[in-house]
């Protein structure tokens, strides 16, 4: 994969901001960013396509719970690093589970913003 130039990094940043601020569903925002990123950095889009094809071919996600399904019991660290059990969180009410890879992941940031407005 080739490296991203500073000018292209800026173009991706602006594309993210446009997608984040656009009126539309989360899927429309994600699709718009994916298309913009392919225009700016085709090698990245091709690498993502290969990864998705490999995951789909290997059944990636087939056994994952779907929206509305009960989650299996688990523990994860909270914001201070202390392990918290799902069962203890459920005592306070419903729980939403999201996987956020980091501030550097535009797709994750769009997903968080769809669930937590203003994030």
Regions found by a protein language model. Name each.
Residues 1-92:
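Non-globular targeting/processing and membrane-anchoring segments
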Residues 86-113:
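Short active-site neighborhood of thiol/selenol oxidoreductases, capturing the structured segment around
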Residues 115-119:
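Short, intrinsically disordered, charge-balanced linker/junction segments flanking boundaries
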């Amino acid at each position: 994969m080739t490296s991203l130039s500073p000018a292209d990094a800026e173009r991706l940043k602006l594309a993210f901001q446009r997608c984040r601020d656009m009126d539309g569903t989360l899927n429309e925002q994600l699709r718009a960013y994916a298309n913009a990123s392919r225009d700016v950095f085709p090698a990245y889009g091709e690498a993502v396509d290969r990864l998705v094809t490999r995951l789909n071919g290997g059944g990636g996600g087939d056994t994952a719970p779907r929206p509305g399904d009960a989650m299996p019991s688990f523990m994860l660290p909270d914001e201070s690093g202390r392990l918290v059990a799902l069962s203890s969180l459920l005592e306070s009410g419903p729980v939403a589970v999201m996987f956020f890879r980091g501030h550097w992941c535009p797709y994750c940031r769009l997903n968080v913003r769809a669930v937590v407005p203003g994030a």
